[in-house]
Amino acid sequence: MKSVYIISVVLFFFTSCSRHVKNECLFQMNHVEDRKIMLSELIDSVEYVPLETVESSLLPALSKLLYVRDFIYASADMEIMKFDNKGKFIGKLSEFGNGPQDYLNINDYDIVLRDSEVEIWVCHQKGISRYNAEDFSFLGLISLDIPVLHFKYVSDDAIIIQTSGEHSFCLCDKNGVVRNEFLSNDPANLSHSLMQFIETEDGIFCILANTDEALYYNKQSEGLELIHYVGGIDNVLTRDDNRAYMERYGYLEHPQKVAQDFVNIVTFRKKGNCSMFFLRSGKGEKVLINKNGDDEWESYDIYPNPTIENDLLTGLDVRYLLTMSSCDSDDAFMMSIPAHMLAGALVNGKVIDAEDNPILIKYQLTN
């Protein structure tokens, strides 16, 4: 596809917004109520998972973390670490080099479930390399003629690629054959977060640079669509705003200016009927929560004057909720706390050292 088609499509009980006709969105925030609450009243089923710290498992302060089928995976420079569901270090993928099964860099990775097999896929300058998640053996290379910045596996016939080529996105198959291309390259509206793709039961989102638009893979229709995925947020950043500010202020000043003048959608997660959105503007940061899949939302300030009192990890700024943006779990909400923020605390019978690996916190929202 050489041009972008803007369509609206029925998605179960939701109707998406097209580029020009703004109907109901996948997430509609018509009714938002500001509240105050204790953190323990907001989340439950809390599980703390300190990731084991040994010389061969050291992680950077910021790492992409995935919890899939009771195992935890974490990116660390040129390696992918693997831990069990208690945080015990199991092993790592480490194939840096020039050989046919090696990679010279890791732009992104994903944990891919193919039938009964679990694989680690890594994208780099040569394409996407596949490895067995059990023994880290090399399974093959998907060669691509375009640079792969980020990717998300959907099926053998559908791999979403974010690229710096002529188009921003494309859809290819397991053989590297490009099926469709989307969005002419638009630097102002491309982000490069650790967790670039967000998966829900119905589809996969790639938020376009903190705006109200996303490239959306609809699992029902098996196609990519450009949609306004959220509605009801006043002064929300749009792609047009983003582009205009880039042209006006330039590459360096642009992010600060749009963060000051608009409401930016930092990230979101949806588990079952429960959704959490994190918003940032010149006035501060908020989390919006929905527990029933309707248009009734609860709004809580998390900075600078939080309306959530942290009674679970006393003394820790509730802004740590935002670490959800770098991690995801297949069965719960999850966040990642740098060890230095919990130094001296007793977690699962262990005193946390400032130099330890991050501590994962899995949780559900209260009913």
Residues covered by each model-derived region:
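Repeated scaffold domains used in trafficking and secretory/extracellular systems
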Residues: 60-64, 103-110, 146-154, 189-197, ...
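C-terminal motif of bacterial Sec signal peptides marking the signal peptidase cleavage site
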Residues: 15-16
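Short coil/turn segments at the loop-to-beta-strand junctions that recur within blades
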Residues: 55, 94-102, 143-149, 184-190, ...
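Short beta-strand elements that form the blades of beta-propeller/WD-repeat-like
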Residues: 71-76, 110, 117-123, 157-164, ...
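Conserved blade-ending motifs and adjacent loop-strand segments that build the rim/top face
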Residues: 230-240, 294-328, 343
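A short helix->beta-strand "capping" segment at the edge of beta-propeller domains
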Residues: 33-59
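Loop/turn-rich, solvent-exposed surfaces of beta-rich toroidal or solenoidal domains
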Residues: 257-306
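Blade-loop segments of beta-propeller domains
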Residues: 52-56, 89-116
